Amino acid sequence: MDKILILDFGGQYTQLIARRIRDLNVYSEIVDYDISIEEIIKKNPKGIILSGGYDSVYGDRSIKPNKGIWDLNIPILGICYGFQVMMQENGGQVENDKDSEEYGSTDIRLTTNELFENIELDNNCWMSHSDSVIFLPKGFKVIASTNKCLVASACNREKKFYGVQFHPEVTQTTFGNQLLQNFVYSICDVAGDWEPKNIKLEKIEEIKSIVKDDYVLCAISGGVDSLVAAVLTAQAIGDKLYCVFVDHGLLRKNESQEVCALLKKLIGKNIFLVDQKQLFLSKLKGVVDPEQKRKIIGKTFIEVFEKVANKINVPFKYLLQGTIYPDIVESGSKFSKTIKSHHNVGGLPERLQFELLEPLKYLFKDEVRKLGLSLDIPYQNVYRQPFPGPGLAVRVLGEITEDKLEIVREADFLFRSYIDQLYKNSEHKPWQYFTVLTNSKSVGVVGDNRSYGYTLALRAVDSMDAMSAKWYKIPLEHLEKISSIICNKVKNISRVVYDITNKPPGTIEWE
């Protein structure tokens, strides 16, 4: 299978680059910026992309790729910081020039070049840089400019080195997808054979080669990711997989029963339901910080699994988790800053007795869904809404109590039921929609009496891969009806508000 290697210099969009390449049916893999030449040769990529980053290439602590990368005779595309690294390492010069700083949407003038094939020459791109290339290496020429940045793109056609100061991976660069397509297909000459059926076969073989004759304990959370991971692993190793579903009391209405029924149907045997509602509530008592909630839940999950594993009396070696790419992104990579820890990657204790098995960790959400369909998981289950591993604990702001959980659980059920009915015949249904119980109270009126209840937030977004999201524009008349239904049917709710924050700057979940 042809692949594109992406060297990660810590930029916030590195995983988005990988996502865009995979959209083109080309496998992409993210590796550390300082990967050895031997390892690159072993991976045998058709092309290399150098990601953006936070540093300045001329700084004392700047990070650079292995120098041998320029002699591999492999096409290379540098993006933002990656472009500047390419220029400096090949004899060019980069400086901080206040007059050439650019942030946001920027008009750009392209020249005729294979990188810009089938692209309008007068166009618009997304810039985010304070440093600029001021002197080109020998053999390079300028192929794009803006009013402030004379070297917005450059190339050495003989070596097949290309660089852009802007970000083609973000949707704000209107021609970005076409540029990436030109690079991978026209310049790198890839086959384009990255498809769900290939993912399935590759992942099954990967699991078999890792697990061999050992046993796997699966951590089922109730979400799409852990379900797909479990069914995939079951097809790979059969009866050596044991699934444990922990009811931590933080699930949506009727979810525990629905998940267990589905697991028995899809996997069959070795399914264990563990009721630990009171344990999790006791551990979370008095905790208000969202990071602490996530870590406590992750740690408690592992403690429960260790006890269950001992009771089952099977020599488990691996713990299966449904970690996917966005989970890892938001928990911070080698150089990027942590947005929030993920329960699968940020809360595990050092004494963990299992080795982790995470077959989905390099897949995006829509790729996981496609994989799920190829595994014959029913469509309605594959395309159910994303639900965080910590469950309603991160949808109740402040301290977790049984009363608060019941409030947000019932409100969430009413909201989701209304939206499901409203958009049942529409192709433009929100990607994710849920309620958040804030820790704020406000005065209301019930009948002739004063009330003092919680403020509930409604959240609905449109997204493809959870890397970015836009708030969904539910018609106002329906928001009014939803508010009325919730306030009338759910006790202790006196006010309903609608969250209109995109991601970025916000995250999809509130905590």
UniProtKB/Swiss-Prot annotation:
Keywords: ATP-binding, Glutamine amidotransferase, GMP biosynthesis, Ligase, Nucleotide-binding, Purine biosynthesis. The active site is at 80 (nucleophile), 167, 169. Pfam families: GATase, GMP_synt_C. One of its GO terms (cellular component) is cytosol. Disulfide bonds: none annotated. ATP binds at residues 221-227. The keyword Ligase applies. Pathway: Purine metabolism; GMP biosynthesis; GMP from XMP (L-Gln route): step 1/1. SUPFAM superfamilies: Adenine nucleotide alpha hydrolases-like (SSF52402), Class I glutamine amidotransferase-like (SSF52317), GMP synthetase C-terminal dimerisation domain (SSF54810). Residues 194-384 form the GMPS ATP-PPase domain. CDD domains: GATase1_GMP_Synthase, GMP_synthase_C. One of its GO terms (molecular function) is GMP synthase activity. Catalyzes the synthesis of GMP from XMP. This is GMP synthase [glutamine-hydrolyzing]. The lineage of its organism: Bacteria, Bacillati, Mycoplasmatota, Mycoplasmoidales, Mycoplasmoidaceae. The gene is guaA.
